[in-house]
């Protein structure tokens, strides 16, 4: 039977999805299932790894059944995943010894402080590109080994395996035959040397983590094993995987140095490909691993802001100013400007490039003439201002002045936000026709790995732009508006 499709498994923080793409990179079928969020203590976040697998395997079966696609027609399955989330399971039984500790979980803060006290902060920064923060997997692994009864003894005997979610899914898909990760996910563990592309012995020793626990690191664009859908039909190759933000970067075909994308979700993630050079940030960004045009390792600068779409949710759920996120464009467009109002959504502090956990949200510039439309417009503009903060930091670090920014995520449907993003950055903003770029990136990697597509050049002919947003304000206005934003941010940090 002819191979007509590639399936992307998109395992996210709140739901598992499966998306079928055809040879023209069009979406054929989508299936999605949410799963339980667990909050056992303040600041702790967990998932049940078996529920993640149950939700992911069920949507894989469902997405094919819904479109009437036979497993023989599927060329490959690609994987993209929430990064950093940590699972440890028994090699012999496949049973997790503890819930997955989610990237948002802060329980390992004390371990990070211990590493800082040991003088490891600069070593971590130089060799992993990351900050010493509970966000990343390494300290989560140590917490499990230290706190789950018998875990450390089992680990020392080589009876346990660790994986981020990509590794866990491949292990389950291949029925325990393959224990593997890719460089983009390995680079988020705090244990991976991004220069030698190997696990870092000094950090493993500092965290007391046995090497036997860790998966083999294989290229993002390669075949890892095979699986059968529900144990039936012919075997399908499991091929191609990347962490969610790197998958989106590849899905946008940002495979050359200086190309960048911004994902507008709950927060915003801006990544710029820096090619074969790992650029160290001096402006609050992370250095991470990306995927090059032939599936090889490239590097990227990454900046994240905590409050993107979450700011709009706040307008809806807490203030009641809108009924639906899509209402914001209508209200923002009813006024010519914000009437001097700036909203700084530092509800949980500020992310990159400030990294200020003590900053708090505020609305500045309120006068008697300020109304709902001005506040809604200021909320939308805050998303673009924060993205400009990241873009300016990237320009300083990389020496590359960006001319075009590719965008994806739910908020890119908002034309007002996209136009203001172009205006305030003085950069052309490109919105793709297929906004599911994270899943598309996983599909591209899988398809390239098995020869479903020949090269990135072929893929470029399939990537269509829905709309170009061209900067449309003068330099003087741009400088004045951004100066107002910078002043507002400074006051939230005072």
Swiss-Prot record:
<feature type="binding site">
    <location>
        <position position="13"/>
    </location>
    <ligand>
        <name>ATP</name>
    </ligand>
</feature>
<dbReference type="GO" id="GO:0005524">
    <property type="term" value="F:ATP binding"/>
</dbReference>
<feature type="binding site">
    <location>
        <position position="84"/>
    </location>
    <ligand>
        <name>sn-glycerol 3-phosphate</name>
    </ligand>
</feature>
<keyword id="KW-0808">Transferase</keyword>
<dbReference type="InterPro" id="IPR000577">
    <property type="entry name" value="Carb_kinase_FGGY"/>
</dbReference>
<feature type="binding site">
    <location>
        <position position="244"/>
    </location>
    <ligand>
        <name>sn-glycerol 3-phosphate</name>
    </ligand>
</feature>
<feature type="binding site">
    <location>
        <position position="13"/>
    </location>
    <ligand>
        <name>sn-glycerol 3-phosphate</name>
    </ligand>
</feature>
<dbReference type="Pfam" id="PF02782">
    <property type="entry name" value="FGGY_C"/>
</dbReference>
<feature type="binding site">
    <location>
        <position position="135"/>
    </location>
    <ligand>
        <name>glycerol</name>
    </ligand>
</feature>
<feature type="binding site">
    <location>
        <position position="266"/>
    </location>
    <ligand>
        <name>ATP</name>
    </ligand>
</feature>
<feature type="binding site">
    <location>
        <position position="84"/>
    </location>
    <ligand>
        <name>glycerol</name>
    </ligand>
</feature>
<feature type="binding site">
    <location>
        <position position="135"/>
    </location>
    <ligand>
        <name>sn-glycerol 3-phosphate</name>
    </ligand>
</feature>
<feature type="binding site">
    <location>
        <position position="414"/>
    </location>
    <ligand>
        <name>ADP</name>
    </ligand>
</feature>
<feature type="binding site">
    <location>
        <position position="245"/>
    </location>
    <ligand>
        <name>glycerol</name>
    </ligand>
</feature>
<comment type="similarity">
    <text>Belongs to the FGGY kinase family.</text>
</comment>
<feature type="binding site">
    <location>
        <position position="244"/>
    </location>
    <ligand>
        <name>glycerol</name>
    </ligand>
</feature>
<dbReference type="InterPro" id="IPR043129">
    <property type="entry name" value="ATPase_NBD"/>
</dbReference>
<feature type="binding site">
    <location>
        <position position="410"/>
    </location>
    <ligand>
        <name>ATP</name>
    </ligand>
</feature>
<dbReference type="GO" id="GO:0005829">
    <property type="term" value="C:cytosol"/>
</dbReference>
<comment type="function">
    <text>Key enzyme in the regulation of glycerol uptake and metabolism. Catalyzes the phosphorylation of glycerol to yield sn-glycerol 3-phosphate.</text>
</comment>
<feature type="binding site">
    <location>
        <position position="13"/>
    </location>
    <ligand>
        <name>ADP</name>
    </ligand>
</feature>
<feature type="binding site">
    <location>
        <position position="83"/>
    </location>
    <ligand>
        <name>glycerol</name>
    </ligand>
</feature>
<feature type="binding site">
    <location>
        <position position="313"/>
    </location>
    <ligand>
        <name>ATP</name>
    </ligand>
</feature>
<dbReference type="GO" id="GO:0006071">
    <property type="term" value="P:glycerol metabolic process"/>
</dbReference>
<feature type="binding site">
    <location>
        <position position="309"/>
    </location>
    <ligand>
        <name>ADP</name>
    </ligand>
</feature>
<dbReference type="Pfam" id="PF00370">
    <property type="entry name" value="FGGY_N"/>
</dbReference>
<dbReference type="GO" id="GO:0004370">
    <property type="term" value="F:glycerol kinase activity"/>
</dbReference>
<feature type="binding site">
    <location>
        <position position="17"/>
    </location>
    <ligand>
        <name>ADP</name>
    </ligand>
</feature>
<protein>
    <recommendedName>
        <fullName>Glycerol kinase</fullName>
        <ecNumber>2.7.1.30</ecNumber>
    </recommendedName>
</protein>
<feature type="binding site">
    <location>
        <position position="309"/>
    </location>
    <ligand>
        <name>ATP</name>
    </ligand>
</feature>
<keyword id="KW-0067">ATP-binding</keyword>
<feature type="binding site">
    <location>
        <position position="15"/>
    </location>
    <ligand>
        <name>ATP</name>
    </ligand>
</feature>
<dbReference type="InterPro" id="IPR005999">
    <property type="entry name" value="Glycerol_kin"/>
</dbReference>
<dbReference type="GO" id="GO:0006072">
    <property type="term" value="P:glycerol-3-phosphate metabolic process"/>
</dbReference>
<feature type="binding site">
    <location>
        <position position="14"/>
    </location>
    <ligand>
        <name>ATP</name>
    </ligand>
</feature>
<dbReference type="InterPro" id="IPR018483">
    <property type="entry name" value="Carb_kinase_FGGY_CS"/>
</dbReference>
<feature type="binding site">
    <location>
        <position position="410"/>
    </location>
    <ligand>
        <name>ADP</name>
    </ligand>
</feature>
<comment type="pathway">
    <text>Polyol metabolism; glycerol degradation via glycerol kinase pathway; sn-glycerol 3-phosphate from glycerol: step 1/1.</text>
</comment>
<keyword id="KW-0418">Kinase</keyword>
<feature type="binding site">
    <location>
        <position position="83"/>
    </location>
    <ligand>
        <name>sn-glycerol 3-phosphate</name>
    </ligand>
</feature>
<dbReference type="InterPro" id="IPR018484">
    <property type="entry name" value="FGGY_N"/>
</dbReference>
<keyword id="KW-0319">Glycerol metabolism</keyword>
